[in-house]
Amino acid sequence: MPEIRTFLCRSDNIGVLIRDPATGACAAIDVPEAGAVLRVLGETGWSLTDILVTHRHFDHVEGTPEVKARTGARVTAPAKAGDAVPEVDATVREGDAVRLGSLVAAVWETPGHCADHVTYWFERERIAFAGDTLFTLGCGRVMESPPEVLWRSLSRFLALPDETAIYSGHDYVLSNARFALAADPDNPNLKARAELAERVKRDGRFLIPTTLGEEKATNPFLRATEPALARAVGMAPGSDPAAVFTALREWKNRF
């Protein structure tokens, strides 16, 4: 199994390093902040070979030029990001495979938060790097497309095994938990998860990774097919889940 380190960048971004112990190949998933990535590389002694970009937003790529200059890492980014990601060596689209030593990730195009967003899915290891598409107890803001586009992207995750580890690009767990409890107040799994989130934050940690099973049980944005969530937005049970999701996302925007 790969070695993975997570760490805080900027104010709420989550930096991630993944290393293949068989070959020493190591990737950063986005570079929100050069200093944090370089510090953790120094602490681990790992040598960075790759940077895998999930999307073009500044808070995910700001540190890319410095980290590439310091490490010589190869930068892979979504083809649809165009020139918005600096220092790109290779681009990827839906269905491409990215190799990190002996590890192989399938590239999913997961638009909704932004049009160029991709997820890196390591099927053998059951690990998904979801960027700003799926968060612990939440999902990304819809910025460039109708909300149903993000719902379609999120629906792809629902087909993955429950034990899949989900690494997201931000730690918004407390605000996400508050909204989730407002939308799904009678969910006992959610209540326990929200209490855990409070304890973890008090300890200076974060609930990343999460698992798909945990999110299916507690994340309102993955539960748009559930009668309780339809009722929460004033819709009848059995309503179109894309419409329920849209109403939930619009509610969260105002929350």
Curated annotation (Swiss-Prot):
This is Hydroxyacylglutathione hydrolase. Zn(2+) 1 binds at H55, H57, H113, D132. Gene3D superfamilies: Ribonuclease Z/Hydroxyacylglutathione hydrolase-like. Monomer. Binds 2 Zn(2+) ions per subunit. GO terms for biological process: methylglyoxal catabolic process to D-lactate via S-lactoyl-glutathione. It is an enzyme of class 3 (hydrolase). Its cofactor is Zn(2+). Belongs to the metallo-beta-lactamase superfamily. Glyoxalase II family. Pathway: Secondary metabolite metabolism; methylglyoxal degradation; (R)-lactate from methylglyoxal: step 2/2. It holds the Pfam family HAGH_C. Keywords: Hydrolase, Metal-binding, Zinc. It comes from the Bacteria. Its EC number is 3.1.2.6. The gene is gloB. It catalyses: an S-(2-hydroxyacyl)glutathione + H2O = a 2-hydroxy carboxylate + glutathione + H(+). Thiolesterase that catalyzes the hydrolysis of S-D-lactoyl-glutathione to form glutathione and D-lactic acid. GO terms for molecular function: hydroxyacylglutathione hydrolase activity; metal ion binding. Zn(2+) 2 binds at D59, H60, D132, H170.
